[in-house]
UniProtKB/Swiss-Prot annotation:
Manner of cofactor binding, per the entry note: Binds 2 magnesium ions per subunit.
Residues at which Mg(2+) 2 binds: D305, N307
Subunit structure: Monomer.
Chain positions recorded as Mg(2+) 1 binding sites: D290, D305
Protein name (Swiss-Prot/TrEMBL): Inositol-tetrakisphosphate 1-kinase 4
Presence of the UniProt keyword Glycoprotein in the record: no
Source species of the chain: Glycine max
Annotated binding of 1D-myo-inositol 6-phosphate, by residue: K38, K80, G173, H178, K210, Y212, N288, N307, G311, K314
Recorded name of the encoding gene: ITPK4
Stored Gene3D superfamilies: 3.30.1490.220, 3.40.50.11370
GO biological process: inositol trisphosphate metabolic process
């Protein structure tokens, strides 16, 4: 059985050799993982696996060529593979092995694969009493059935304001699904292939806040983003422009000399409430939120994307945060067993 983002048996054997060393903890926690090779490299860095091993955590690669129930036993399973086959495997395992913590439930993850549904939970929130306002840019969904030539008409009919950000509707883990286009006029959108989500562009000072969630822990990292667009520029420029993934590690803004009005982090009470509500509504432990502050305001924020199991390797101090989180899951489960006994 080979799945999207498969792990080779050689990688599995090497990982088992690396995780077979003695730990300094009396209690060992076994974390099975099913990750793409790229994800494994960025997430399971030596600094992380070494710290985790010293605190009693062993990472073991799941062999995708063998039935999952025949492997383990596991305390926790970490996974991020695409495809219906894997989804069915992990869902079946989760139902039959409730003693194992699966991060995260497949159905909950699926919710974030659609950019329309992922932001609906933010729209449903009421955070008016939390030192700020959080919303979602006005958006329009263009389904696969739509003729691209009809997009300008749909935009005009919906009363969307230019410029518009166009993103693929489906997030499937590929680089293509994270591309975005910036359209200065509605007619140029005929060149972009549906299905799409069109969002009104909100000027935000060229800065984006990546809010990493690991259980109850919140970490904020600033990233450079698309610059403000003036009315003058909008009147002179036409066309649609393609951008790669905007918020990458190389575009870190944490050490830059920025205008304090732009660079100031969102209020902590607001982030804590937002993270808590989304954890509950999404049913996820591991995700990040891409948030912007409307330029010229202090407390008006927009969520523009939510990603499952993001690139935690880019989050400062992720090794300690993740190690503490994994141990807390096991400790919580042990405590619940004692209370039930």
């Amino acid at each position: 059985m080979r799945l999207n983002g498969e792990i080779s048996s050689g990688e599995e054997e090497e990982e088992e050799k690396q995780t077979g060393t003695t730990t300094f903890s009396s209690q060992k926690v076994v974390v099975g993982y099913a990750l793409t090779s790229k994800k494994k490299k960025s997430f399971l860095q030596p600094s992380f696996t070494g710290l985790a091993r010293n605190r009693g955590i062993n990472f073991v690669a799941i062999d995708l060529n063998k039935p999952l129930p025949e492997q383990g036993p596991f305390d926790i399973i970490l996974h991020k593979l695409s495809g219906e086959v894997w989804r069915e495997i992990i869902e079946d395992y989760r139902e039959k092995h409730p003693e194992v913590t699966v991060l995260d439930p497949p159905d909950a993850i699926q919710h974030l694969h659609n950019r329309q549904s992922m932001l609906q939970d933010v729209l449903d929130l009421n955070l008016s009493d939390c030192h700020g306002k959080v919303g979602v840019p006005r958006q329009l969904v263009i389904t696969k059935e739509k003729d691209p030539s009809s997009i300008p008409y749909e935009v005009t009919k919906a009363g969307m304001k230019l410029p518009l950000v166009a993103k693929p509707l489906v997030v499937d883990g590929t680089a293509k699904s994270h591309e975005l286009f910036l359209a200065y006029d509605e007619f140029s959108l005929s060149a972009v292939e549906p299905p799409l989500v069109l969002q009104e562009f909100v000027n935000h000072g060229g800065l984006l806040f990546k809010i990493y969630i690991v259980g109850e822990t919140i970490k904020v990292v600033r990233r450079f983003s698309l610059p403000n667009i003036s009315k003058r520029e909008l009147s002179k420029v036409a066309g649609v422009f393609r951008f790669p993934r905007v918020s990458c590690a190389a575009a870190s803004a944490d050490d830059a000399d920025l205008d304090p009005n732009i660079a100031e982090h969102p209020p902590r009470p607001l982030l804590e409430r937002l993270a808590r509500e989304l954890r509950h509504r999404l049913g996820l432990h591991l995700f990040n939120i891409d948030m912007i502050r409307e330029y010229g305001t202090k407390d008006v924020f927009y969520v523009i994307d939510i990603n499952y199991f993001p690139g935690y390797g880019k989050m400062p101090g992720y090794e300690h945060v993740f190690t503490d989180f994994l141990l807390s899951l096991v400790e919580s489960k042990c405590s619940n067993k004692k209370l039930a006994a």
